[in-house]
C-alpha cells in the first residue's frame, strides 16, 4: 500500500483538508510512509490551519522553499499568492479600461457598448467581442440581442463592484499580477472615483496590485498640465491612493504611467513640465512610466529625443504594429533589443507592450474583417512573450484585460456570441485560453518556466 501523498497547490481559491497519519519533519528528504508532501507555486506562500475558518499560518522550509511536509493532525491548507507591490520587477500587468456602463447600473446610458447612449443595436455597436457572461452575478439585458439558442444576451457594467471582483478573481486564479487602471484626463475634472474604488477593493481582497495610467488623449493642451496634476494631487490628498498597500511602488515611490507622449500632440515644453512635476515634486513624486510612440528611439522631431529619455521607465505602444511573416501577421518586436539598450543607456527600465491580436470593425463602422490582426490561436501573443524572454525582460504590459472595443481583451470571451451582429471570437479556444497564456507568459518572464517558441500548454 502506498501511503505517501503528494499534492500540488496552484490556486488561491483552492482549499484542501488532509489527515496526516504520522509525524513529519520540515525536511527536503524524500517523504516517509504516512507523510503528506505539499508543493506550491513559487509566486505564493503556503498557509495552513487546523480548521477551514483559520487562523491561517504561513509555513516555510529553509531546505526547499516550495515544498513542505505536514505534521500529524487534520490540516487545511491554501496558497496565498499576494503579489509583491513594492517593485515593478517580475511584474506582468494588464491594461484595464473599466469604462463600460449599462442602463440600470445607477446611470441610464450605454457607454463603450454603443455609440448611442440610449440604444444598443447592430448598427450602434462599438465593441468587437462579446464577453462570456456565465460567471457574472450582475448583468444587464441588451435588448434585441440573443444567443444562438434564442436566449436573451447580457452585458456587464464596470460600475458594479461585483464585475470588478469577478475580473480580479480571474487574475488571482490564473496568476496575473494586476493592472494599470486607465484614467482619462479629459474626464477627471470632477475626480470620479467609482471604478477606482472598485479596483482598490478588489485588489486588496485578492492580493493583486494596481497602478494608475493617465491617458492624455483628447485633453486640450492649454489645460492638460493643470487637469492632470490637479487630479493626482486630489487622489493623493483625499483618497491617499499612494498609501494603499496594493498600490504598486518601485524604488519606494508610487508607480504612475502617463500615456500619450507623441511628438505631434503637444510641445516639448509641455512634456518637460509634466515630467518635471511627477519626477521632482516632494509630496506627489512618482516612479514615472512614459507611454507613447513605439518609434521613440528614432524620433527626429526637435527636442523629443531628450523627452523620451527622461522617464524612469518607457513603454512603447505597440498595438497595431505588426510584420508579415509568410501568410501571417506577427507583432513587430525586432526593435525591442535596440530599445532596451537605449533605455538602459538613459538610465531607464523598459516595459514592452504585448497584445493578443486586434480588430475594431464595429467601432470604426467598417466591413467585418477589415482591420483584423488574427490571434493565430494564441501564437501571436505567445511569440511576444518568447521574444521578451529571450531579451531577459522580466516585466511587460499586456494590452488589454477588458478591451473588447479594439478586440485586444484577454479575459473570458464568448465563442457563441449573439447572432444579430458581427463579433470576433476565440475561434473555438476555451473562454479562459488567453488568461492561461498570460499566466504562462508571466512564468517565462519571471523565470518559473523554460522559454520555448511554441505554446507550452494545450486548450
Feature names for model-found ranges:
Residues 82-459:
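Glycan-processing catalytic domains of CAZymes
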Residues 5-10, 16-82:
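Short, composition-biased motifs enriched in small/polar/acidic residues
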Amino acid at each position: 500500500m502506498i501511503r505517501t501523498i503528494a499534492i500540488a497547490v496552484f490556486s488561491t481559491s483552492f482549499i484542501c483538508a488532509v489527515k496526516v497519519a504520522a509525524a513529519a519533519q520540515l525536511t527536503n528528504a524524500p517523504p516517509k510512509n504516512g507523510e503528506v508532501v505539499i508543493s506550491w507555486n513559487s509566486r505564493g506562500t503556503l498557509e495552513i490551519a487546523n480548521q477551514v475558518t483559520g487562523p491561517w499560518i504561513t509555513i516555510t522550509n529553509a531546505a526547499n522553499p516550495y515544498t513542505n511536509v505536514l505534521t500529524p493532525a487534520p490540516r487545511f491548507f491554501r496558497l496565498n499568492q499576494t503579489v509583491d507591490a513594492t517593485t515593478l520587477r517580475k511584474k506582468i500587468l494588464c491594461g484595464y479600461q473599466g469604462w463600460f456602463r449599462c442602463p440600470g447600473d445607477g446611470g441610464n446610458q450605454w457607454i463603450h457598448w454603443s455609440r448611442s447612449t440610449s440604444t444598443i443595436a447592430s448598427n450602434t455597436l462599438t465593441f468587437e467581442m462579446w464577453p462570456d457572461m456565465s460567471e457574472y452575478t450582475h448583468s444587464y439585458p441588451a435588448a434585441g440581442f440573443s444567443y444562438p439558442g434564442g436566449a436573451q444576451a447580457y452585458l456587464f457594467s464596470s460600475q458594479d463592484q461585483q464585475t470588478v471582483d469577478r475580473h480580479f478573481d480571474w487574475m488571482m486564479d490564473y496568476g496575473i499580477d494586476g493592472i494599470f487602471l486607465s484614467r482619462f484626463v479629459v474626464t477627471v475634472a470632477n475626480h470620479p472615483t467609482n471604478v477606482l474604488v472598485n479596483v482598490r477593493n478588489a485588489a486588496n481582497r485578492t492580493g493583486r496590485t494596481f497602478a494608475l495610467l493617465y491617458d492624455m488623449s483628447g485633453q486640450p493642451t492649454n489645460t492638460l498640465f493643470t487637469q492632470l496634476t490637479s487630479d493626482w494631487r486630489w487622489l493623493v490628498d483625499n483618497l491617499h491612493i499612494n498609501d494603499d498597500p496594493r498600490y504598486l511602488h518601485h524604488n519606494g515611490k508610487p508607480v504612475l504611467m502617463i500615456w500619450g507622449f507623441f511628438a505631434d500632440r503637444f510641445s516639448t515644453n509641455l512634456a518637460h513640465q509634466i515630467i518635471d512635476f511627477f519626477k521632482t515634486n516632494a509630496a506627489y513624486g512618482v516612479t514615472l512610466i512614459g507611454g507613447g510612440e513605439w518609434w521613440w528611439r528614432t524620433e527626429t522631431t526637435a527636442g523629443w529625443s531628450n523627452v523620451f529619455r527622461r522617464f524612469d521607465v518607457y513603454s512603447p505602444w505597440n498595438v497595431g504594429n505588426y510584420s508579415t511573416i509568410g501568410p501571417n501577421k506577427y507583432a513587430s518586436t525586432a526593435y525591442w533589443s535596440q530599445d532596451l539598450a537605449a533605455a538602459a543607456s538613459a538610465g531607464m527600465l523598459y516595459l514592452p507592450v504585448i497584445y493578443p491580436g486586434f480588430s475594431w470593425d464595429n467601432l470604426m463602422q467598417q466591413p467585418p474583417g477589415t482591420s483584423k490582426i488574427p490571434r493565430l490561436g494564441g501564437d501571436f501573443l505567445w511569440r511576444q512573450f518568447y521574444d521578451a524572454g529571450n531579451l531577459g525582460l522580466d516585466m511587460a504590459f499586456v494590452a488589454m484585460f477588458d478591451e473588447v472595443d479594439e478586440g485586444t481583451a484577454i479575459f473570458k470571451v464568448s465563442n457563441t456570441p449573439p447572432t444579430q451582429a458581427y463579433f470576433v471570437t476565440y475561434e473555438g479556444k476555451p473562454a479562459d485560453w488567453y488568461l492561461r497564456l498570460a499566466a504562462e507568459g508571466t512564468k517565462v518572464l519571471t523565470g518559473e518556466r523554460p522559454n520555448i517558441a511554441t505554446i507550452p500548454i494545450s486548450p
